[in-house]
């Protein structure tokens, strides 16, 4: 299990380390990306394939409503159907929903920011035999103190580890 939480920029992984990470996940290892884990490794296209998207912008930092789109998944079963929270909201360079084998778990209720459009915030996919989960939330410390967020992340760790 590998977790990249709130990383950004071009990190100092050499080609051997990058290949080892992808091989680990392809062989059945788990990967979780949290918040700015999509704002890194822009020059490594396989990483974008792994996470499902690259960060484009964060136009909203405010109180928002988040909708649970898949309440049956082990990482969202404990969540109410709608969450109200304050965070920095990411928008991505590509359409996450268009990716094969990808299921959106959480999405922004666009009406809560006076916008139109589709804004996925958390999803899961596979990479080879590995399970991958990404959640764009988690910019502010206050969210990490919320029991629902910690429960969701703990369930994500268990799920990506295959438990």
Regions found by a protein language model. Name each.
Residues 3, 32, 103-105, 133-135:
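Hydrophobic/aromatic beta-strand patches that form the interior of the parallel beta-sheet core
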Residues 113-119, 126-163:
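Extracellular ligand-binding/catalytic regions of CAZymes and related secreted enzymes
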């Amino acid at each position: 299990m590998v977790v990249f939480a709130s990383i950004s920029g071009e990190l100092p992984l050499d080609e051997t380390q990058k290949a080892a990470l992808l091989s680990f996940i392809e062989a059945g290892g788990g990967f979780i990306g949290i918040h700015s884990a999509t704002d890194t490794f822009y020059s490594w296209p396989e990483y974008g394939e792994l996470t499902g998207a690259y960060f484009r912008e964060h136009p909203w930092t405010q109180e928002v409503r988040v909708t649970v789109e898949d309440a049956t998944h082990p990482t969202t079963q404990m969540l109410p159907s709608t969450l109200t929270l304050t965070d920095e909201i990411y928008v991505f360079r590509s359409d996450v929903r268009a990716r094969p084998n990808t299921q959106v778990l959480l999405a922004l209720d666009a009406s809560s920011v006076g916008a139109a459009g589709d804004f996925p915030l958390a999803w899961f996919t596979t990479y080879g035999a590995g399970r991958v989960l990404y959640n764009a939330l988690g910019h502010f410390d206050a969210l990490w103190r919320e029991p629902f967020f910690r429960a969701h992340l703990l369930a994500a760790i268990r799920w990506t580890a295959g438990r």
